[in-house]
Amino acid sequence: MPNLQTVAQLLALFVIITSGPAIIILIALRRGNL
């Protein structure tokens, strides 16, 4: 069974890759509103 820390790092990397563009768009919208 893989290490729990390794699984957590892979999951975090997956979340960053999949939600990266959405976070960038959200930041851009907030800066635009300000």
Curated annotation (Swiss-Prot):
List GO BP terms, alphabetically: photosynthesis
Record carries keyword Chloroplast = yes
Q: Where in the cell is it found?
A: Plastid, Chloroplast thylakoid membrane
Keyword terms of this UniProt record: Chloroplast, Membrane, Photosynthesis, Photosystem II, Plastid, Thylakoid, Transmembrane, Transmembrane helix
Its chief place of residence is plastid
Which GO cellular component term is one of those annotated? chloroplast thylakoid membrane
Q: Does the keyword Magnesium apply?
A: no
Which positions, given as ranges, span the membrane?
Answer: 7-27
What the entry lists under Pfam families is as follows: PSII_Ycf12 (PF05969)
Q: How is the protein disposed in the membrane? A: Single-pass membrane protein
* Biological role stated in the UniProt entry: A core subunit of photosystem II (PSII), probably helps stabilize the reaction center.
Hey, which family's this protein in? Belongs to the Psb30/Ycf12 family.
This protein's assembly is summarised as:
PSII is composed of 1 copy each of membrane proteins PsbA, PsbB, PsbC, PsbD, PsbE, PsbF, PsbH, PsbI, PsbJ, PsbK, PsbL, PsbM, PsbT, PsbX, PsbY, PsbZ, Psb30/Ycf12, peripheral proteins of the oxygen-evolving complex and a large number of cofactors. It forms dimeric complexes.
Q: What is this protein called?
A: Photosystem II reaction center protein Psb30
Q: Which organism is it from?
A: Guillardia theta (Cryptophyte)
Write the lineage as a comma-separated list: Eukaryota, Cryptophyceae, Pyrenomonadales, Geminigeraceae, Guillardia
